[in-house]
Each structure stands twice: as structure tokens, then as C-alpha cells.
């Protein structure tokens, strides 16, 4: 990744990449470069063709369910970090099931369960029981938790989990150390290898992402895609997905903003992903504005979140207007707060 000089690519390199039937790694590097910015419309046209060829008009909806926000890491950009003064909460199993019922009643069939990265507060057995509960209500169950060992992933799969998503945050090792000041998350290689351990543990699919804006987004976008590219060759029958989140403000630090990656650049990255990895699912979360999400699902994205709350135990308030007053604080601010029905109607 360090050797990637994106400024060396020319308009001719980008044109050649778009003319090739199969996108090589070198072509992908050209499509991520500044030289590709004037070709965004052509990239979008090509991406739309690839999406239609492999996914048709299908767009999947899911909702994240945060079940705990205790964390043992000190990540300077995250609202859950252990030094941030927020209201901490861990849902009981009764509360988890109540939240799931509310979500399922909205018509959602896929859920992504998340915790803060604390084994002490959210151990594997706790997460496993939450998966068992989720099986009663949802057809597809994802996890976004702290990285675990392959035998623990196998246990979670047996409990009902179908896929695992892990944010590497940034693939820049030096910057990674400056952003993660304490906790198990400081161990870069263990996190990097999490998706492979999940596949070894029997998970059907794995998701990848860098958090754009933490470091050079050209290089992080390249590394995220290559992470999948090489793992695909080792585990060709697994399902793979990419997310492309940008930094969002957090409680007690509203100066964190995704100013380093603009929407046009984000669109370029997503189109490049689709052209380079035509079979890979692409998720766009509620971190992005509704106009962007409504547009990108017509081009490259295959999955979007709906009815989102990043607080703990906050879905009843979100869906019914009833506020228990006991929810835990959110991880970050969302940009698209539309309900499931509103997102569904926008997709029609």
C-alpha cells in the first residue's frame, strides 16, 4: 500500500482501465486516482452495468441493533471509546428480544448486531444467546463485534450468525497506532486476520471496511479491496461485502467530520469497487445523506440500512415514539434517519 503513488496515473491509464473487460489490480489503482475524477460519469455507467449483470435490481435492507456500548479500547475517533463520558448500557436478553420484535414488525428480515469491544461486558456467550434470539425473528444475522478466535466464530455461527463485518479502520500501520491508544484493538495483525478466522469458523460471509478520513483514503480504499481480492482466491465460495463509511461526529467531539472525503470522491471509490469486484456486495450506511444513498443504489450499492439508531435500546423510541429514557448513548451521529418504510418507498 505504501508504494501506491496514485498521482502517477494519467487520463490514458483511466481510459484503458474502462476499456478492459476485466479490471486488473493496476486498472483499479488508476480508477481510484485523481486522474479518474473527470471520468466519474463513465465509471458510474460501467458500475451500473456490472451491478445489473450480477445483482439485477435487488437492494437489501437491514437494520443495526446495538446491544451494548461498553468498550475497552481508546480509539480517539469513536463515541464508544473507554474514556468518553457517555451513558453506558448493556441490554438484557429480555430487552434484546423486545428490540428485535419492534424491528421485525417493521418488515426488516436482516439484522446486524453490534457491541462495543469489551469481552468483560459482552462476552461470546452473551452474543451467542443474542444470536439465538435473533433466529426467531430474522432470516439473515450479521455481527459487528470485537475480533475473536476461529473456534469462537464457529460457536457464534452455530448460535445463528451468518456473517461477520470487521472495520480495519485504516490499513496505515503507523497512523493506526496513533489512533488506537489503548486496548486489544492496538494489535493490528489480529484484527486484519479476523475475516479469515470467521470463514475458518464456518461463517457464510464476511464484510470489510476502512473508515475513510482517518488516513489517505486512496490507499485505504485500495487496501480494503485488495484485502477481499486475495482472500477471495483462498475462499472462493464465501460471500464478501464492502462498506465505505466516512467519519461522523461523536458525542463530546463534534469537530470530527468527514471533510477529507467528499461525496464525489466517495462515489468514485464505490464505482471503482464495483468495476474491480463485480460479485461483491456493497453496503452504504446511514452515515451518508439520503440523496447520496438514493442515488448510489442505482449505480453500485446493493445493501442499505433503514430505521437506524446507533443508541443502545433505542429502537422502540425510533419506531413507536415511546421513549423509555433508559437507552445508552450512540456511537456516532447518523445522516439518514428515515424509517424502513421511507427507505423502501424511495427504492421503488
Kindly give the residue locations of the regions a language model identified.
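Glycine-enriched alpha-helix->loop->beta-strand junction motifs that scaffold or abut catalytic
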Residues: 157-163, 202-204, 278, 298-305
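Generic structural signal for well-ordered alpha-helices
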Residues: 63, 100, 127-131, 153, ...
Amino acid at each position: 500500500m505504501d508504494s501506491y503513488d496514485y498521482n502517477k496515473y494519467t487520463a490514458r491509464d483511466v481510459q484503458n482501465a474502462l476499456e478492459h473487460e476485466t479490471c486488473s489490480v493496476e486498472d483499479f489503482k488508476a480508477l481510484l486516482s485523481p486522474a479518474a475524477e473527470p471520468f466519474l460519469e463513465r465509471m458510474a455507467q460501467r458500475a451500473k452495468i456490472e451491478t445489473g449483470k450480477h445483482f439485477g435490481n435487488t437492494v437489501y435492507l437491514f437494520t443495526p441493533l446495538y446491544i451494548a456500548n461498553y468498550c475497552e479500547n481508546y480509539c480517539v475517533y469513536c463515541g464508544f471509546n473507554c474514556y468518553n463520558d457517555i451513558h453506558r448500557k448493556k441490554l438484557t436478553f429480555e430487552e434484546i428480544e423486545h428490540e428485535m420484535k419492534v424491528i421485525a414488525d417493521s418488515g426488516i428480515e436482516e439484522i446486524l448486531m453490534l457491541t462495543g469491544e469489551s469481552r468483560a461486558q459482552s462476552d461470546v456467550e452473551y452474543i451467542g444467546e443474542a444470536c439465538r434470539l435473533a433466529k426467531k425473528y430474522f432470516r439473515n444475522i450479521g455481527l459487528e463485534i470485537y475480533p475473536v478466535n476461529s473456534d469462537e466464530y464457529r460457536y457464534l455461527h452455530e448460535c445463528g450468525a451468518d456473517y461477520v463485518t470487521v472495520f480495519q479502520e485504516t490499513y496505515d500501520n503507523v497512523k493506526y497506532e496513533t489512533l488506537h491508544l489503548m486496548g486489544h484493538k492496538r494489535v493490528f495483525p489480529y484484527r486484519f486476520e479476523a475475516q479469515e478466522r470467521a470463514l475458518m469458523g464456518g461463517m457464510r460471509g464476511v464484510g470489510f471496511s476502512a473508515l475513510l478520513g482517518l488516513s489517505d483514503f486512496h490507499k485505504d480504499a485500495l487496501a480494503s479491496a485488495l484485502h477481499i481480492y486475495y482472500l477471495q482466491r483462498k475462499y472462493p465460495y464465501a460471500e464478501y461485502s464492502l462498506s465505505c463509511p466516512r467519519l461522523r461526529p461523536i458525542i463530546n467531539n463534534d469537530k470530527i467530520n468527514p471533510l477529507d472525503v467528499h461525496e464525489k470522491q466517495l462515489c468514485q471509490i464505490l464505482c471503482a469497487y464495483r468495476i474491480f469486484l463485480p460479485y461483491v456486495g456493497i453496503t452504504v450506511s446511514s452515515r451518508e445523506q439520503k440523496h447520496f444513498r438514493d442515488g448510489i443504489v442505482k449505480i453500485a450499492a446493493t445493501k442499505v440500512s433503514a430505521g437506524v439508531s446507533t443508541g443502545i435500546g433505542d429502537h422502540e423510541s425510533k419506531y413507536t415514539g415511546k421513549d423509555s429514557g433508559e437507552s445508552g448513548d450512540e456511537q456516532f451521529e447518523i445522516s439518514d434517519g428515515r424509517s424502513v418504510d421511507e427507505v423502501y418507498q424511495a427504492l421503488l
